[in-house]
Amino acid sequence: MAADIRIVPCLTDNFGYLIHDPSSGATASIDAPEAAPLIAALEKEGWKLTDILVTHHHGDHVGGVAELKKKYQCRVVAPHDANAKIADIDLRVEEGDVVRVGGLSARVLETPGHTLDHISYVFDDDRALFAADTLFSIGCGRVFEGTYPMMWESLLKLRELPDDFKLYCGHEYTASNVKFALTIEPDNAALQARAKQVEQQRAAGQPTIPVTLGEEKQANLFLRADVPSVAAAVGLPGESAADVFGELRERKNNS
């Protein structure tokens, strides 16, 4: 039976996510930006939280962990080298590990760059990628702890997933990401189409997530740093994809 996924807006622009296995009743929260909205969503659905799958240590992703752990006695899964900012870790995971949530299986990918401990969770059977702050729709996370080549390699790892996977990212940044991307690739038809879709979604008060990886591969600049036209657009024809990515990220930082 397919997983049920709920998007739970948290804080100012964070996404919390609940993924539920109808067969076993198990439910995981992907990160826990704050407890109250997640508790409300769980109670609305009649679900009991069994697991929290943490992607990285930033406070806007783990701020609700301690309260949820206390209330539900749930298991906290976190990156193997996560620091002390994450409370009460029960299981540390690394590349290639598989985390089971009832009958659901999540494969762990190490995706460092935004932070050194960042991981993503891949639910292959449910065609769902929870990439937190590594990959956004039409964007990517700032590189706080890693390097640009490191972040580029992480994005390449996610780009290898099939086109039909749906991306669930950490923040609602899509509108601003689209605005920036159009300054680099104004003639990208896939980006233009996504821009119209995002405008309609935001006007209706709807989230811009999920989106398929196939769409992102066509429209997201940060997944296309190895495309010659993108390199040329930032004045780096013939340079390495990592250097082009770094230039894109610097420009986005200053936009």
UniProtKB/Swiss-Prot annotation:
Gene Ontology MF, one: hydroxyacylglutathione hydrolase activity
Cofactor note: Binds 2 Zn(2+) ions per subunit.
Enzyme nomenclature, EC number: 3.1.2.6
SUPFAM superfamilies: Metallo-hydrolase/oxidoreductase (SSF56281)
Cofactor(s) this protein cannot do without: Zn(2+)
Catalytic activity reported: an S-(2-hydroxyacyl)glutathione + H2O = a 2-hydroxy carboxylate + glutathione + H(+)
UniProt KW keywords: Hydrolase, Metal-binding, Zinc
Positions of Zn(2+) 2 binding: D60, H61, D133, H171
GO annotation (BP), single: methylglyoxal catabolic process to D-lactate via S-lactoyl-glutathione
Residue positions binding Zn(2+) 1: H56, H58, H114, D133
CDD domains in the cross-refs: hydroxyacylglutathione_hydrolase_MBL-fold (cd07723)
Pathway per the UniProt entry: Secondary metabolite metabolism; methylglyoxal degradation; (R)-lactate from methylglyoxal: step 2/2
HAMAP family associated with the record: Glyoxalase_2
Function: Thiolesterase that catalyzes the hydrolysis of S-D-lactoyl-glutathione to form glutathione and D-lactic acid.
Similarity section: Belongs to the metallo-beta-lactamase superfamily. Glyoxalase II family.
Subunit structure: Monomer.
Stated name of the protein: Hydroxyacylglutathione hydrolase
